[in-house]
């Protein structure tokens, strides 16, 4: 006999037992004979029975699901972090529901609302949004929220490294290695900031770079927001007696820069240095 997906009531009737007995069998609880349990499980498979987890979650007040709203997964840093979160969640009996904002604040809002409608037990957010209105929206959801990478405000639990201090340490380390000209690569920073996107983390890196230069007495430095090949190659080949290093705010532009220099016969690290934050 062929069945379509059935309800717990239909499965109980087919097995000749109560709904409570079916519930004990499919959830592996005590108070039921092994032979009865096996019969119910066999019938459940034949009848394609699927427990209504949403109804169950409403009854117990939790879905054992965590929502993750990330920027994207093209950056290896985000991909590895999301994978680690998923593995840890599963070890604690939770599954994750993932949505990507693709650097679009509107898509981020849609994703957050989606998670709330699915009654996730909490949201791990890589925020693009910022400000009082955004914070108020999140608080009204009544869902525990942890932010990663960009900070919103102190009311939310935040997980990140001290980007500002780390970048100061980077400048100090490079100065000790003999580099005396440090060019900072920060693609599209002002465009993102003026567009209302949360740039807290990368702004802290930029501030740390500038503070590091001041501490090492290396002048005002040079910040580039466009990955212009002619300009970058020109700087790298400039014969001015300076030992140059390009500091990239993350590894993505660092990899692009290495490829660009290799194609233009610029040796790394013999001719210039490259370092990425991530």
Residue ranges and their predicted role:
Residues 1-63:
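N-terminal helix-turn-helix DNA-binding module of bacterial transcription factors
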Residues 2-7, 45-83, 92, 102, ...:
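N-terminal helix-turn-helix/winged-helix DNA-binding helices
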Residues 3, 46, 87-92, 140-147, ...:
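Bacterial carbohydrate/catabolite-sensing allosteric modules
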Residues 14, 21, 58-74, 181-195:
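Short beta-strand segments enriched in small/hydrophobic residues
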Residues 37, 79-83, 135, 199-210:
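Short, surface-exposed alpha-helical segments at coil->helix boundaries
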Residues 46-52, 106, 127-128, 258:
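Short gly/ser/thr-rich secondary-structure transition/capping motifs
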Residues 87-132:
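Central regulatory/effector-binding core of bacterial HTH transcription factors
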Residues 130-141:
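Active-site-adjacent beta->alpha loops and helix N-cap segments on the catalytic face
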């Amino acid at each position: 006999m062929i069945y379509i997906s059935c309800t717990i009531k239909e499965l109980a009737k087919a097995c000749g037992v109560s709904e409570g007995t079916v519930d004990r069998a499919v959830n592996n609880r005590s108070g039921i004979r092994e032979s009865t349990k096996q019969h119910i499980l066999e019938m459940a498979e034949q009848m394609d029975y699927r427990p209504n987890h949403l109804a169950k979650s409403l009854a117990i007040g939790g879905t054992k699901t965590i929502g993750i709203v990330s920027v994207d997964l093209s950056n290896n840093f985000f991909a590895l972090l999301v994978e680690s979160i998923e593995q840890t969640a599963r070890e604690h009996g939770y599954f994750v529901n993932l949505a990507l904002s693709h650097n679009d604040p509107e898509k981020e809002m849609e994703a957050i609302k989606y998670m709330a409608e699915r009654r996730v037990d909490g949201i791990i957010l890589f925020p693009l949004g910022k400000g009082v209105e955004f914070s108020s929206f999140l608080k009204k959801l009544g869902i525990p929220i942890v932010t990663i990478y960009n900070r919103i405000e102190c009311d939310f639990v935040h997980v990140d490294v001290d980007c500002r201090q780390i970048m100061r340490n980077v400048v100090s380390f490079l100065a000790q290695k003999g580099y005396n000209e440090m060019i900072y690569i920060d693609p599209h920073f002002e465009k993102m900031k003026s567009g209302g996107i949360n740039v807290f983390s990368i702004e802290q890196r930029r501030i740390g770079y500038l503070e590091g230069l001041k501490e090492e007495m290396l002048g005002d430095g040079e910040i580039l927001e466009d990955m212009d090949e002619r300009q970058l190659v020109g700087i790298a080949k400039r014969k001015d007696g300076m030992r140059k290093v390009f500091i990239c705010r993350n590894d993505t532009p660092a990899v692009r820069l290495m490829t660009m220099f290799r194609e233009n016969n610029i040796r790394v690290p013999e001719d210039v240095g490259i370092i990425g934050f991530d």
